[in-house]
Amino acid sequence: MKSSIVAKLEALYERHEEVQALLGDAATIADQDKFRALSREYAQLSDVARCYTDWRQVQEDIETAQMMLDDPEMREMAQEELRDAKEKGDQLEQQLQVLLLPKDPDDERNAFVEVRAGTGGDEAALFAGDLFRMYTRYAESRRWQVEILSANEGEHGGFKEVIAKISGDGVYGRLKFESGGHRVQRVPATESQGRIHTSACTVAVMPELPEAEMPDINPADLRIDTFRSSGAGGQHVNTTDSAIRITHLPTGIVVECQDERSQHKNKAKALSVLGARIRAAEVAKRQQAEASTRRNLLGSGDRSDRNRTYNFPQGRVTDHRINLTLYRLDEAMEGKLDMLIEPIVQEHQADQLAALSEQE
């Protein structure tokens, strides 16, 4: 491992030890804000510190094994120990390189997830409903909270569009690669000839932004309309114009929110989604520029990019970005998404490592 990387790891390890000592200090415990900040930093440093400690131990094991090679009686055992230690050292080195990759500050944030039916009419709306259920099941498995902000239901079920806020640890970091086009191939319930139809949906995942990072939005650039909520809401539904539709005139972005009975609360939520969408558009524009100079896993950020195909007759799901095919469609639709998410995260990390190597 390069000496510059070892020096960086040593500094992080020392900071980890320093933070650990500070967390046990009475003055820190008395200051709750400082205690929370240091606790977060400690959690962020722990994986690096633990992995670096293991790597240092392996280097010592390698030195010991090399010294044993000079002893004829110990040589065979030393060769085996040396081989095992070097293999473990290589694995730890790879882990440390990944842990040192620049972190996306948005990864730990909550996320807004939008699912929209595309081509395919009623079948696309039904598939949008299936996708949203899939994400909801995945969220439940990770103990995240799902809150529907707006839902435009299809005529025969599913959704023409549904927007939800998903809250929990690391939501955006896990779901951000879901943004893009999702295609389904199956026989619709209304198909009497048994022919397979192809329909499509688009998914957009955006981090929820703290107030301080919201883009500046001029109130004069907004057109705000109120209308009666059309979703489930018990006896009060359709009695007041509590639902909100906000149009950002410079970009043409439109956001609706009809979750709350309070017009004020719906407006606040809609503005939050609007801010996230405006920032997402800016990020996509920047990624498009970066993609012109090197291959970028996220493509141009264009939502028409084809991420996955879900083929029901074959029980197959294919991620076209990394040429991954699994015959475990039923599990995926029940929210077991880590088998699809983890490979794309690893591919992204490999791209980051390659980019860093090019810079060196």
Curated annotation (Swiss-Prot):
The modification N5-methylglutamine is found at residue 235. This is Peptide chain release factor 1. It is found in: Cytoplasm. InterPro entries: PCRF, Pep_chain_release_fac_I, Pep_chain_release_fac_I_sf, Prokaryotic/Mito_RF, RF-1. Belongs to the prokaryotic/mitochondrial release factor family. One of its GO terms (molecular function) is translation release factor activity, codon specific. Residues 285-314 are annotated as: Disordered. Keywords: Cytoplasm, Methylation, Protein biosynthesis. Peptide chain release factor 1 directs the termination of translation in response to the peptide chain termination codons UAG and UAA. Methylated by PrmC. Methylation increases the termination efficiency of RF1. GO terms for cellular component: cytoplasm. Pfam families: PCRF, RF-1. It comes from Klebsiella pneumoniae subsp. pneumoniae (strain ATCC 700721 / MGH 78578). The keyword Magnesium does not apply. Disulfide bonds: none annotated.
